[in-house]
Every structure is written in structure tokens, then in C-alpha cells.
């Protein structure tokens, strides 16, 4: 009888430990997502470009979904350089045009077809570190203004970039096919 009680007691402790570890793991993931939200919204201010405006406010239905595919974008004219104009932006602040070409804020939501849904954490972190699309050095560089900002994001530690990734994977996917980056002649790279 004593032996059965001992075995039962050990089983209860073992199961309790497994549950506690599982809860701690969920809490740890929730903490990481919360940290990522803080970094995305308050520190890196990703929504400033990646969330289109609806008037003076952000269009939260398009939170981090990038430049709307059906929205017009600015077109840079090289004569503007003589007027010291080097960057044009759309009214939504999600498309940018300059001597480099035209770039569009990407869809950062986890949508599998139009966002980061097929990316891996490694691709995301490598992209921030290398300033190349999908973190692949054979891919094109990330264009301004994001290409300029990623040199700052590259200084973030791995824990912060992983937290940002965890948060981006946790938000609602939004289907929004962002236009490809255009070269100076208005053609996709």
C-alpha cells in the first residue's frame, strides 16, 4: 500500500512538473510576443510605413500589411534633383520614390501568399542583418528608406529580433499583394 502511495505521489509530482514547464513555456512565448509588440510599435515604429493611413489615422484593418496594391504611388523625375528634391512619398507614407527607383512598404503580416507567411525566423533575422531581401545575399538589397533603417535594426540583439519575429507571426494575416520594387525606369527589378 505504501509503495502504491509513493508511486502515486511521484506520478502527481511528475505530471505537475510537466504542466508547470508547459505553462512556463507558454508564458515565455507570450512574454516574447509582448516584447515583440513593444519593439514593433514603440521602438522600431514599423507601422509608420508598413500600416497605410486612413486620413490622419492608421488603417488598422491593414495593420502592417504594407502599401495597398491598388493605391497610386509617387513617380520621381530626375529634373527634381535640380530642385534638391530627393524623395517623394505617397499620402499613405507607404511608397517612396527617388533616384534609386520606387520602393513600397512590404506586407509584414503572416499571410502565406502576400506576406511573411512563408519566411522563416532565420530569413527574417538574416534580412535585418544583411539588408538583403529574405536574408539571401544573392537577392536584391532592401531599398530605401527601409534599406537605410536596417543598418540600425542590424544592431538589435538576437533576442529582440526573435521577439519581433514572434510578434509578426502572431498578428492577423492580411492579404495584400504589394507591388515589386521598381528601378529608375519604372520596371520591376
Regions from the language model: what does each represent?
Residues 23-41, 54-56:
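Electrostatic cytochrome c docking/interface patches
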Residues 126-134:
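Glycine-rich, acidic and aromatic/proline-enriched surface loops and short helix-turn segments
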Residues 36, 43-53, 124, 164, ...:
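The canonical Cys-X-X-Cys-His
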Residues 1-12:
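N-terminal Sec-pathway targeting helices
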Residues 51-103, 133-189:
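Flexible coil segments in periplasmic/lumen-exposed cytochrome c-class electron-transfer proteins
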